[in-house]
Amino acid sequence: MDLCNFYCCYLLKSNRTQSSGAVYIGSTPDPPRRLRQHNGEIVGGASKTKHGRPWSISCLVYGFPNKVSALKFEWNWQNLGISRYTKDCDFRSKKQKTIMYCLKGLKHLVDSDTWRRWPLNITFLNKTAFSKWNQLGKTYGNINVYFDEEWLNGFHEKVIQKTYDHKLCLRKTISEPVKCNLCYECIESDELRANCPFTDCNSINHLTCLASSFLTEECQVLPIEGMCTKCKRVLRWREFLSTVFTTSLETDERDFESENRIEIIDLELEK
């Protein structure tokens, strides 16, 4: 059983020639391996990107609560012209599907009411793409944006193994029945729970109770930040979400790649 639920969406750009403008949007639980597939270094799909090699990752979007959520985001990013979040924003022209077109679509998605409060991260691995992103203005809501050219290096140690070890530790600390620090009711094994991410605080709560306490002064469904009821530290909602799990989790996280991909647009062929 794999306890890590990391799943990201990514934007590729073809580097076949200096002026190549082909782009591709996909999703994966393992970006380094998926990039190798796109570039033909290992087998395993990615046939649609065969003619644009070599490819590089311009940016990744991650922090989704599960694979289904990531795939929903991926579909909307791939289909900006018909997505209900962007269909009124002039994304219908096929010739506009450049790197800037995709970044504008990404900006519209993360600024929408649906995703702006999700604990998402956007990491840029390419300076040019990051510069283009900054031209689009400030990102609102609960989204963090980073630039890190070396993000893929040590991916498994930084993301996969860290998450795996953290969740194993959480399971060990609450293997016995515990009570929610907010409602004082026993937390059942199949209920979502979240604990304070600080190691010197052992606060554990029902996820729903914690969300309600964070939303006492808000009219939204998803909170942004609040105070830990025990250590009194102010924390962002995303920090609590990183600790969420159930003790009865038995989901087998398989390496699943979405079949729905954005159509590759090679601008060189259109010239």
Curated annotation (Swiss-Prot):
Needed cofactors: Mg(2+); Mn(2+)
Entry keyword Kinase: no
Start-end of SLX1-type zinc fingers: 180-231
Keywords, in A-Z order: DNA damage, DNA recombination, DNA repair, Endonuclease, Hydrolase, Metal-binding, Nuclease, Nucleus, Zinc, Zinc-finger
Gene3D superfamilies referenced in this protein's UniProt entry, alphabetically: GIY-YIG endonuclease, Zinc/RING finger domain, C3HC4 (zinc finger)
GO cellular component, one term: Slx1-Slx4 complex
Coiled-coil region: none
Entry keyword Mitochondrion: no
Broad enzyme group: hydrolase
A Pfam family matched in the record: SLX1_C
GO biological process: double-strand break repair via homologous recombination; maintenance of rDNA; replication fork processing
Domain of life assignment: Eukaryota
EC number: 3.1.-.-
Annotated compartments: Nucleus, Nucleolus
GIY-YIG domain boundaries: 5-87
PANTHER family: STRUCTURE-SPECIFIC ENDONUCLEASE SUBUNIT SLX1
Subunit structure: Forms a heterodimer with slx4.
Protein task: Catalytic subunit of the slx1-slx4 structure-specific endonuclease that resolves DNA secondary structures generated during DNA repair and recombination. Has endonuclease activity towards branched DNA substrates, introducing single-strand cuts in duplex DNA close to junctions with ss-DNA. Has a preference for stem-loop (SL) and splayed arm Y structures. Introduces a single-strand cut in duplex DNA on the 3' side of a double-strand/single-strand junction with respect to the single-strand moving 3' to 5' away from the junction.
HAMAP family: Endonuc_su_Slx1
Full protein name: Structure-specific endonuclease subunit slx1
Name of the encoding gene: slx1
